Amino acid sequence: MVTVEEVRKAQRAEGPATVLAIGTATPPNCVGQSTYPDYYFRITNSEHKIELKQKFQRMCDKSMIKKRYMYLTEEILKENPSMCEYMAPSLDARQDMVIVEIPKLGKEAATKAIKEWGQPKSKITHLVFCTTSGVDMPGADYQLIKLFGLRPSVKRLMMYQQGCFAGGTVLRLAKDLAENNRGARVLVVCSEITVVTFRGPSDTHLDCLVGQALFGDGVASIIVGADPLPEIEKPLFELVSAAQTILPDSEGAIEGHLREVGLTFHLLENVPALISKNIEKSLNETFKPLDIMDWNSLFWIAHPGGPAILDQVEAKLGLKPEKLEATGHILSEYGNMSSACVLFILDVVRRKSAANGVTTRILSIGQISKSLLILAWFLFSLV
């Protein structure tokens, strides 16, 4: 007679979860950061706000961003002028766009991940879909199943309104799914577009301007599974450990509220200090049991919340400049893509690094909690 323990053991994988493939995509519309203030104040009919525009120009100049990709074009915004105002009701127009475009963009990245994986998409057993946009029923997870032609029996998890820390969260969830379901292959999709947050400027809400200067559109997809098939699947990273914590005294530091005007963004000035003040405690709790105390001995995959956060983390931990190089590259070339950023950075690290067996650290921050993962790096040559 089979015992319950034997059944449970048979349901679990033998080894740890691994990242088996990565795919990324963006909308085709590319926006240069140096000229964005002129465009933004013109399209929002705010050119008369000269001092505010000068402040926004300084924000963009200091952002470390060269360009971003955005679904919203000038033509779309001219057809939806309410989205260009600061407080005009516009949620219906925004929703009509995102419920179509979020899964559509997700399909592009998922297609690339499946191609790299080299296995038929019929072998996908689980789907984790994450976005800050487009709350709807049925959700973007269901729409992707239909668009992509996945099996109707794929087990789905839809994550809305998670924010910037969600890049670490989806990896943690995918790890649990892969390790507790023998043979599971988890398709993860993080699809983000700024349709819900774009709005005109306000003299009294400068943190909204910070968001307009930083956020961009992008989607990333990964496939996660344990016990990779020899000679068939090529593991890129091993997901060793995952943790999450809420920072003390951080309530209200980062907030987003869905209103008739869209998703409003609220950010306190002390966010970089909050993170840098608490980061070493989290690092010690995570790595001391592994006898790792040299933060420069790790690969870093840090979510690029903004230049001030990166600068203070680097200074607090005494990190060498190259440790956050991949993060800086993604911030420069794409801006802050919320949940998708960490997966974009994973892609950069695996493509540029020739290291083998090195511990990797992921840091994703938002709302305001930290998601921590430890990864082991596999040597892998891209064809």
Swiss-Prot record:
EC number: 2.3.1.212, 2.3.1.74
Catalytic residues (positions): C164
Molecular-function GO terms, alphabetical: naringenin-chalcone synthase activity; protein homodimerization activity
Keyword Lipid metabolism: no
Tissue expr: Expressed in fruits.
Alphabetical GO biological process terms: flavonoid biosynthetic process; polyketide biosynthetic process
Pathway: Secondary metabolite biosynthesis; flavonoid biosynthesis
InterPro entries cross-referenced by the UniProt entry: Chalcone/stilbene_synt_C, Chalcone/stilbene_synt_N, Chalcone/stilbene_synthase_AS, Polyketide_synthase_type-III, Thiolase-like
Regulation: Inhibited by glutathione.
SUPFAM superfamilies to which the protein is assigned, alphabetical: Thiolase-like
Induction (record text): By sucrose (at protein level).
Top-rank EC class of the record's enzyme: transferase
Keywords: Acyltransferase, Chromophore, Hydroxylation, Transferase
Record's catalysed reaction(s): 4-coumaroyl-CoA + malonyl-CoA + H2O + H(+) = 4-hydroxybenzalacetone + 2 CO2 + 2 CoA; (E)-4-coumaroyl-CoA + 3 malonyl-CoA + 3 H(+) = 2',4,4',6'-tetrahydroxychalcone + 3 CO2 + 4 CoA
Pfam families hit by this protein: Chal_sti_synt_C, Chal_sti_synt_N
Activity versus pH, per record: Optimum pH is approximately 8.0.
Biological role: Bifunctional polyketide synthase producing both 4-hydroxybenzalacetone and naringenin chalcone. Can use p-coumaryl-CoA and ferulyl-CoA as substrates. Catalyzes the initial key reaction step in the biosynthesis of phenylbutanoids.
Family that this chain belongs to: Belongs to the thiolase-like superfamily. Chalcone/stilbene synthases family.
Summary of subunit composition and partner proteins: Homodimer.
Protein name: Polyketide synthase 4
Organism: Rubus idaeus (Raspberry)
Taxonomic lineage from the root: Eukaryota, Viridiplantae, Streptophyta, Embryophyta, Tracheophyta
